[in-house]
Amino acid sequence: MSHLQEEYIMFRKMRRAEKKAIPNEETIRLLQESKRGVLAVAGDDDYPYAVPVNYYYDAAAGKIYFHSSLAGHKVDAMKRNPKICFTVYGEPEIKDLDWAPYVKSVVVFGKAQPVADPEKKRAVLKTFAMKYYPNEAEADEEIELDFRAVQMIEITIEHMTGKEIQEK
């Protein structure tokens, strides 16, 4: 079975999927090309807590990775409950001279956990850094400065959908 698991009862089906769902290839491309997403966790007193994060998507493993400090609101929330929702959306696009833009988005449900193995953490952090830094030397320098002060969080995808809506 692929990392995109079959539909389970615990995840709702997308409304009007026949009109709004985008192909899996587009969903993956949006995850690979976007630079920021919004991570939502069950925060303090069960209030939702959503925060933008930089990330990278490892298509081969079917995992999403982002970096975090070692402590804080989202870290505490993920320790209490590893279930997360992660959303990425693309740039608005005008089609066929229509006035209202179309926007593609991806919504991921999964479980988050810190990358515990230091070697894996370093490898994941390097791949992450190469998405954002202009060259390997700068990425390596930043990793050496901050390696002990950051953690890499791995999201195991349990359910993922992609869709396109017209905002009108």
Regions found by a protein language model. Name each.
Residues 27, 35, 62, 82-84, ...:
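A generic secondary-structure signal marking the coil-to-beta-strand transition
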Residues 11-38:
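Short, basic/aromatic recognition patches
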Residues 30-31, 77-78, 128:
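A generic structural signal for nonpolar/aromatic side chains embedded in well-ordered alpha-helices
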Residues 68, 73-101:
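Helix-adjacent hinge/juxtasegments
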Residues 38, 65, 85, 109, ...:
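Beta-strand secondary-structure signal
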Residues 2-18, 93-168:
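Charged, gly/pro-rich active-site loop segments
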Residues 34-70, 86:
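Short beta-strand segments
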Residues 56-58, 79, 156:
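Well-ordered beta-strand positions
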